[in-house]
Design a protein with these regions (language model features):
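Hydrophobic membrane-insertion alpha-helices, especially the h-region
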Residues: 14-26
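Serine-dependent protease modules
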Residues: 26-196
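N-terminal Lys/Arg-rich, disordered targeting/topogenic segments
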Residues: 1-9
């Protein structure tokens, strides 16, 4: 009877020990992922800007308050080149860029491709711009965890998370090879960063 009780006690101890080890491993893995997301967000968010466009030719401040389109953009060079979506731009319109340091600057369109909905704009500023580290979209896999950074509803830069749901989406347009994600993307996020 005593021997049977010792065996049962040992089983309970082993099971509890396994549960504790599993929980520690799970918490450590979760913490590593959380830290990776935090580090990636902090690194990338300084490279994301807000894009305001208008056909208004008045001052920067009135242009900001009369903006027709609001979206996001990503700094891709320290010379002030920013990539965004071309649907945000108004033909012959003004472009205003809101930076993470609170500064505003004017931008000019360098080029755009409406078929792929991509535009490059340039701005000149007195402060150092931090370009994002550009990845290789051909290495993205379905199920990869990603972060979307942008300015939804013009409430300020935000980070949302999700996974890659699909790759190579073209929606009937042979120019496109879109990446689909389930990360929350709302009006104002257009042109923002999708990072992994």
């Amino acid at each position: 009877m005593q021997k049977e009780r010792n065996i049962n006690s040992n089983k309970v101890i082993y099971i509890l020990l396994l549960i504790v080890i599993a929980l520690i491993a799970l918490l450590q893995f979760s913490g590593e992922n959380d830290n990776k997301f935090v580090t990636a967000s902090e690194k990338a968010i300084t490279s994301v800007v807000t894009i305001y466009t208008s056909n208004n030719t008045n001052t920067l401040r009135s242009q900001y308050s009369n903006s027709k389109n609001i979206g996001s953009g990503v700094i891709i060079s320290d010379e002030g080149h920013i990539v965004t979506n071309s649907h945000l731009l108004i033909p012959n319109g003004k472009i205003l860029i809101g930076h993470t340091n609170g500064e505003m600057s004017e931008g000019v369109m360098v080029g755009q491709d409406n078929d792929s909905d991509i535009a490059v704009i340039k701005t000149d500023v007195a402060f150092k711009m931090l370009p994002i580290e550009v990845g290789n979209s051909s290495e993205v896999r379905i199920g990869d965890q990603v972060l979307a950074i942008g300015n939804p509803y013009n409430i300020g830069l935000s980070v949302t998370s999700g996974i890659i749901s699909a790759t190579g989406r073209d929606y009937g347009n042979p120019y496109l090879e879109l990446i689909q994600t389930d990360a929350a993307i709302n009006p104002g996020n257009s042109g923002g960063a999708l990072i992994n």
